[in-house]
Swiss-Prot record:
Keyword annotations: Chaperone, Cytoplasm, Stress response
Keyword Isomerase in record: no
GO biological process: protein folding
Main subcellular localisation: cytoplasm
Chain's gene name: grpE
Segments forming a coiled coil: none
Record's subcellular location: Cytoplasm
Native source species: Pasteurella multocida (strain Pm70)
Renumbered residue ranges of the record's region Disordered: 1-34
Name this protein carries in UniProt: Protein GrpE
A Gene Ontology term for the protein's cellular component: cytosol
Listed InterPro entries: GrpE, GrpE_coiled_coil, GrpE_head
Length: 197
């Protein structure tokens, strides 16, 4: 190659480089005119993705907290159900045994000739049986309600009648026709009573 050819080739290369630089400058100017800078665009996109990610994290944390609260509520309800089952599982049995208690009390209330030794020992046996039965049901949370002189409470007493009675204030129980019973504080049978008017 001759010097002339090399010189022409160098000039062409220089012109090409100038032309490329001019194009890049024009592209940058066009982008600047359009207001789109690739770096700014990338920064905006990253910020947008960060905001989306933050929102998703908040939603997931909220979901997690709600799930935990729901699990706690389910566990608490299950514990309460088990506790109620323990407390009141004997309710049907307790209601059924109340008739036996009533019958034993009626047997002891009947007039009898207690001078006869066999009748006296029979009454003593019934009395001991009743005491043992009452002690047993008491251990399981059954308690009697309805005592003469007590103030009438409609939650645990059922008034059969109201009559004026000397020696009693208004709303006091004058006669207990049938004892009532509670099982762990819950009424399983209200006491049937007469109340002073």
């Amino acid at each position: 190659m001759s010097n002339k050819e090399q010189h022409i080739e160098k000039e062409e290369q220089l012109q090409e480089e100038k032309h490329e630089e001019q194009q890049k400058t024009e592209e940058t100017e066009v982008e600047a005119v359009n207001g789109v800078d690739p770096l700014e665009e990338a920064i905006l996109r990253v910020q947008e993705l960060e905001a989306q990610l933050t929102e998703m994290v908040k939603k997931e944390q909220d979901f997690l907290l709600r799930s935990r609260a729901e699990m706690d509520n389910i566990r608490r309800r299950a514990e309460q159900d088990v506790e109620k089952a323990h407390k009141f599982g004997l309710e049907k049995f307790s209601k059924d045994i109340l008739n036996t208690i009533d019958n034993l009390e009626r047997a002891l209330a009947t007039p009898a000739n207690l001078e006869d030794e066999s009748i006296k020992s029979l009454f003593d046996g019934v009395e001991l049986t009743l005491k043992e039965l009452l002690a047993t049901v008491s251990r399981f949370g059954v308690e009697a309600v309805g005592v003469v002189g007590e103030t009438f409470n409609p939650e645990v007493h059922q008034a059969i009648s109201m009559q004026p009675m000397e020696g009693f204030e208004t709303n006091q129980i004058t006669v207990v026709l049938q004892k009532g019973y509670l099982l762990n504080g819950r009424v399983i049978r209200p006491a049937m009573v007469m109340v002073a008017a």
